[in-house]
């Protein structure tokens, strides 16, 4: 005799524990200079994301960092998707939300060597895993018809990230309202 209800309950509990474990694996480290659109301090995972926060703030763009995606995507293998940046703006009197993902890859789609070292896997495995994640995120946006803007580490090497963001945002219809030095100074977090 097999008690399917007990097994199903155990399975649900294990799924929920796995989701919590997956979301806990992300290591938040660096504080951004400016708050998000709600006035809350932002803690990011890389210096490049920190610079993106600075650029978005200086361009007068309203955003939140790692806010849950508007569609439920959590499953046995994934915690709920949290795009790097959710960008909010008004268009025709309606609040719009688009997304910005920053991918830590070079112009060839390769991750830095330390990605593998930090996870104790081979460089090939690190590239495969990271690029699978990129593909999964892009597919989610395509499936639900949400707009995704993308930057990468290569953008920091081959262009000015602020100029790149200004161009991407303008193409997406996001109004730019550049902050003065005084306005930025007033926003600086302690």
Task: Cite the ranges covered by each PLM segment.
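Acidic-and-aromatic substrate-binding clefts and catalytic sites of carbohydrate-active enzymes
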Residues: 70-80, 153-160
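A basic/glycine-biased coupling hinge at the interface between accessory DNA-binding modules
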Residues: 1-15, 19, 154-190
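Short beta-strand-loop-alpha-helix junction that forms the active-site gateway
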Residues: 82-134
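Interdomain/boundary linker segments immediately adjacent to catalytic/signaling cores
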Residues: 1-43
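A short acidic/basic microdomain associated with nuclease active sites
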Residues: 57-77
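Nuclease catalytic cores
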Residues: 41-53
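Conserved catalytic segments around the Walker B and adjacent sensor/switch elements
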Residues: 145-152
